[in-house]
Amino acid sequence: KFAEWMRQQKRLLITDTTMRDAHQSLLAARMRSVDQLEVADAIAQHGDKLFSLECWGGATFDTSMRFLHENPFKRLQRLRERIPNICFQMLLRGANGVGYSNYPDNVIRGFIKHSAESGMDIFRVFDSLNYLPNLKVAMDSIRKHTNSVCEATICYTGDILSSDRDKYTLKYYVE
């Protein structure tokens, strides 16, 4: 039903990455929950035309625990209470979850389940090497065990349509 709704939209569906990328890029992901909650009501009120709000990724999750000594799940739950009208989106590093090495399948499944229960609506799943087996467990878990959306992603750089580029072409990524 969600895909049907998306296809029917005539407007541009915009994802705001401020709650993840802005402070990750500018402040080494050190934005505290209290600061995010300070602007949450304004986001809910003025961002009501947004498709989604990207508020989680590896660095933001890790930093909230390791440096800010906060529980990232509680942060997500509190933001969800204050911003009930916008889809929440996150980056998920496939078999790495939000960490820096591969985790057992049951850990990835449990993380996804708990994240969805805590308020995550859309999981953008990728693998830095585009190794498809590293995506499978996460993508299957999202599709089969949550009501969340699985947004499968590949990573690339450069101009894939340029005739000057002969290795990483559109054909390369399709195959």
Predicted regions and their residues:
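Alpha/beta enzyme core
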Residues: 12-14, 31-55, 65-87, 97-175
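N-terminal amphipathic alpha-helix/helix-capping segment at the start of soluble metabolic enzymes
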Residues: 1-21, 26, 76, 81
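Short glycine-rich or small-residue beta-strand-to-loop segments that form or flank ligand, phosphate
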Residues: 19, 23-27, 62, 123-126
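Surface-exposed amphipathic alpha-helical tracts and adjacent flexible/coil segments at the periphery
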Residues: 1-3, 28, 60-65, 163-165
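Metal-cofactor-binding active-site regions of metalloenzymes
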Residues: 91-95
